[in-house]
Amino acid sequence: MGKENSKVVVLDFWASPYAMRTKVALREKGVEFEVQEEDLWNKSELLLKSNPVHKKVPVLIHNNTPISESLIQVQYIDETWTDAASFLPSDPQSRATARFWADYADKTISFEGGRKIWGNKKGEEQEKGKKEFLESLKVLEAELGDKSYFGGETFGYVDITLVPFYSWFYALEKCGDFSVEAECPKIVAWGKRCVERNSVAATLPESEKVYQQVLKLRQIFGVE
């Protein structure tokens, strides 16, 4: 059995936008995989053993070898399953540009950034979180422009990096009392376009389900 055909397992938590990246990438490549859902409050021995440094999902296990960090996993998937189209452009300059924007999205549109909105009651800290979130989205929207995807007509690396957070927009809007579409209509249109892809539709949870999870987190962290 070739390496690209051996068993693939994702240690997952359904609401994790980072784990969603990995699952979207695998589905884009047509790779069959198993999902092991993790209880993040009672992590499995397999998760702790597979990712001893960060102890976080997602972990991609391929041929019994664990790989941590979602963007590293997406690159690994791209380099391992080469029969399907690459997530990155062929020329070095365009690849570098895509990596720059994926890195920007990863650093600015994040779980921690979202927590500044849902993890605070209405007030100065939440307003600061909203401002930072929307400013970053507007930078990404300017880069997207009128293109179908960040890579033009091709769904790729930057799209895979950012699209999981589309499923969190509704929860952030509800907690922060704002509209992403009013501020960044092209980003929302892009998100809707991405969800038309089977890989994304099969991966992203319903926005209401994410919102209910966020309400639980607010209770756990004493926000409510």
UniProtKB/Swiss-Prot annotation:
Residues 6-85 form the GST N-terminal domain. It is found in: Cytoplasm, Cytosol. Residues 91-217 form the GST C-terminal domain. PROSITE patterns: GST_CTER (PS50405), GST_NTER (PS50404). Keywords: Cytoplasm, Detoxification, Phosphoprotein, Transferase. GO terms for molecular function: glutathione transferase activity. It comes from Arabidopsis thaliana (Mouse-ear cress). GO terms for cellular component: cytoplasm; cytosol. Glutathione binds at residues 16-17, 42-43, 56-57, 69-70. It catalyses: RX + glutathione = an S-substituted glutathione + a halide anion + H(+). Pfam families: GST_C, GST_N. InterPro entries: Glutathione-S-Trfase_C-like, Glutathione-S-Trfase_C_sf, Glutathione_S-Trfase, Glutathione_S-Trfase_N, GST_C, GST_C_Tau, Omega/Tau-like, Thioredoxin-like_sf. May be involved in the conjugation of reduced glutathione to a wide number of exogenous and endogenous hydrophobic electrophiles and have a detoxification role against certain herbicides. Its EC number is 2.5.1.18. Coiled coil: none annotated. One of its GO terms (biological process) is glutathione metabolic process. The modification Phosphothreonine is found at residue 154. This is Glutathione S-transferase U28. Belongs to the GST superfamily. Tau family. It comes from the Eukaryota.
